[in-house]
């Protein structure tokens, strides 16, 4: 069984027992989280597609940790001017483990 959820403006295909990194959520480590923006639920041949959400469906997850991702380096050049600007960014994330899918 798998589901497609929406979190932080992105869509994720999740299965029970899977861990994934979501955009930062204000939830403490070890707490249980309910994701109710479920776009699709599939169980073998039974597929439920929402318009836009599947009613009554939710995905439960446990918060494993919070952290920051890899550094993204931004470099801007101005040609022939001997000018360069460097900048870096590390995005915060919340790592969750999917504990259940209900439809």
From Swiss-Prot:
GO terms for molecular function: rRNA binding; structural constituent of ribosome. The keyword Transferase does not apply. One of its GO terms (cellular component) is ribonucleoprotein complex. Coiled coil: none annotated. The keyword Chloroplast does not apply. Keywords: Ribonucleoprotein, Ribosomal protein, RNA-binding, rRNA-binding. InterPro entries: bL21-like, bL21-like_sf, Ribosomal_bL21, Ribosomal_bL21_CS. It comes from the Bacteria. GO terms for biological process: translation. Belongs to the bacterial ribosomal protein bL21 family. This protein binds to 23S rRNA in the presence of protein L20. HAMAP family: Ribosomal_bL21. Part of the 50S ribosomal subunit. Contacts protein L20. This is Large ribosomal subunit protein bL21. It comes from Chromohalobacter salexigens (strain ATCC BAA-138 / DSM 3043 / CIP 106854 / NCIMB 13768 / 1H11). The lineage of its organism: Bacteria, Pseudomonadati, Pseudomonadota, Gammaproteobacteria, Oceanospirillales. The gene is rplU.
């Amino acid at each position: 069984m798998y589901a497609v959820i929406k979190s932080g403006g992105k869509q994720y295909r999740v299965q029970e027992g899977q861990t994934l990194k979501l955009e930062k959520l204000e939830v403490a480590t070890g707490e249980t989280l309910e994701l109710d923006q479920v776009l699709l639920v599939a169980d073998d041949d039974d597929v439920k597609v929402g318009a836009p959400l599947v009613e009554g469906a939710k995905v439960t997850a446990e918060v494993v940790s919070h952290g920051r991702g890899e550094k993204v380096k931004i470099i801007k050049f101005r040609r022939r001017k001997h000018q360069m600007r460097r900048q870096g960014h590390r995005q915060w994330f919340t790592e969750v483990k999917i504990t259940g899918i209900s439809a």
